[in-house]
Amino acid sequence: MTEENKSFYITTPIYYPSGKLHIGHAYTTVAGDAMARYKCMQGYNVHYLTGTDEHGQKIQKKAEELNVTPQAYVDNIVAGIKELWEKMDISYDDFIRTTEDRHKDVVEKIFKQLVDQGDIYLDEYEGWYSVQDETFYTEHQLVDPIMEGDKVVGGKSPDSGHDVELVREESYFFRMGKYVDRLLKFYEDNPHFIQPESRKNEMINNFIKPGLEDLAVSRTSFDWGVRVPGNPKHVIYVWVDALSNYITALGYGTENEEMYKKFWPADVHLVGKEIVRFHTIYWPIILMALDLPLPKKVFAHGWILMKDGKMSKSKGNVVDPVILIDRYGLDALRYYLLREVPFGSDGVFTPEGFVERINFDLANDLGNLLNRTVAMIDKYFNGEIPAFKANVTEFDETLVTFAKDTLKKVEEAMENMEFSVALSSIWQLVSRTNKYIDETQPWVLAKDEDDREKLASVMAHLAEVLRQTGIMLMPFLTVAPSKMFAQLGLTDEAHTSWGSLSTIGCIPAGTKVEKGQPIFPRLEMDVEVAYIKEQMKASAPKVEEKKEEEPKAEEITIDDFFKVELRVAEVLSAEPVKKADKLLKIQLDLGTEKRQVVSGIAKFYSPEDLKGKKVICVTNLKPVKLRGELSQGMILAGEENGVLSLASIDQNIPNGTKIK
């Protein structure tokens, strides 16, 4: 493989600097950092790009409210973002800002080319616009539409729930439909382009098949942005401006395109699921129009949610990553983000879950294994790691095989962006190694001089597995591995490189261990949970709200309750109900039968999030039709502040089990 073939280009979305970043933003960037570090350790020439999308009406309005220029406003926030990435040890290679000349100059060239070749034309537009989302919607897409007779006169954004306004203005349009067939052919020829797979079906069925309308790509209602060449009253809109960052950052369209030629097309764009459409429909079509290669993969991850839905200052549930890092250390946060949630799915942050991960995984499992190993080597062999010999005890080969299999699992998971799976595999090795200590009982072997060779083998195997564990953790954790290596006396980088994982037992005999402080101290659960909750409450606006008392429900008898039949059901599949933004058509497995239920949870759960979930279903309701679809029951959910959360069941309860 040539050096050129070993390049790897990974990007995050460029973040919108409208306020302070929270743990959700950190999630994407830490994931990108883990992937970049992994590829770098494998010998790839890695280029990791992040940055900020700094133009638009929302930025201009915020700046006006604060009586500062838009540039001064974004400069201040961007400084904070860079400080956060430094604190999180993000190893990005470039930070692109859309207000930089290197970006703006090329965006003007791109827009002019698209106009000159007829892909962009001037016309007039009328549509429902959300300033918060900087997105236009059709009246059929609006949530809670306000009607006057048969006419829609208002409503809310389906993405953020903010109010929309009817906007009529002159605009430049991109001929999207011209490239639809070519885009679908690209999907067919590149089946792994959109990940997870379910996102591809969503793009095709929800956006392309209904008909891809021409896209408004300029605005005249604000002036904070890149001007349209030759028509300066128009500002180039976000679709062309922001998305182009992935190539402008590489020098595309300049006199020096060396970086562009080396790294484009991107190996993977990491994006949140809310911007999949822009990266898998608009961006590929723009690139097709420019006759440029398309990125190899777009990976759409889920959201870090709270128990009461999305993070929001008004709810007092925003988690500031800086607070967690300052109190618990960087590795605790990085580990939690990448371990807790499968990367393509939504996950829920809870203070309890965060502290449990630290105590059980980091302190108990990994920390104790390191402490016990170093202490025993110090006690039984004067702190010197014995020479590695194979198959001295009956348990040695099993442990070595387990370690080799773990490496394969980790590498396979990383190639699929399955960070949680990779970390789970590493922790299975840690658990297996703790079991190896119980099996070999070194404290018993130490009592008999005839077992000296076995004791030495156990110590060498423990040190070796810890070496391998530390190396495999290096993409994820940036502090603990070096502490592990220091306690194991490993100072030669040849023994801590990814390539050294293929050599079992490469620690030189006599390497001196050094006892140290626990790398992850145990936490007091109650104290730390209370602390995190208090910090989250502090994020809420200081406004006293009087909570209305909920009316008490009418009391029923136990006989009334027993009339309701509740059973465990597993979601087999789900899909949107046509012309009904809030409804999902859900197929359930009730053990002895399959049923269809229509539920108003589409705003809170995507179809792919539901698949495989165990839910509670009311099974003896009279079937009804909702929007033309038969509903044969009802799934239970709780509601708080307008956010629905499904009642769920442990996975080990069989489908169809009656709830009593």
Swiss-Prot record:
Pfam families: Anticodon_3, tRNA-synt_1g, tRNA_bind. It is found in: Cytoplasm. This is Methionine--tRNA ligase 1. Is required not only for elongation of protein synthesis but also for the initiation of all mRNA translation through initiator tRNA(fMet) aminoacylation. Belongs to the class-I aminoacyl-tRNA synthetase family. MetG type 2B subfamily. It comes from the Bacteria. Residues 560-660 form the tRNA-binding domain. Its EC number is 6.1.1.10. It catalyses: tRNA(Met) + L-methionine + ATP = L-methionyl-tRNA(Met) + AMP + diphosphate. Keywords: Aminoacyl-tRNA synthetase, ATP-binding, Cytoplasm, Ligase, Nucleotide-binding, Protein biosynthesis, RNA-binding, tRNA-binding. InterPro entries: aa-tRNA-synth_I_CS (IPR001412), Anticodon_Met (IPR041872), Met-tRNA-synth_bsu_C (IPR004495), Met-tRNA_synth (IPR014758), Met-tRNA_synth_2 (IPR023457), Methionyl/Leucyl_tRNA_Synth (IPR015413), MetRS_core (IPR033911), NA-bd_OB-fold (IPR012340). Transmembrane segments: none annotated. A motif ('HIGH' region) lies at residues 15-25. A motif ('KMSKS' region) lies at residues 310-314. One of its GO terms (molecular function) is ATP binding. Homodimer. ATP binds at residue 313. One of its GO terms (cellular component) is cytoplasm. One of its GO terms (biological process) is methionyl-tRNA aminoacylation.
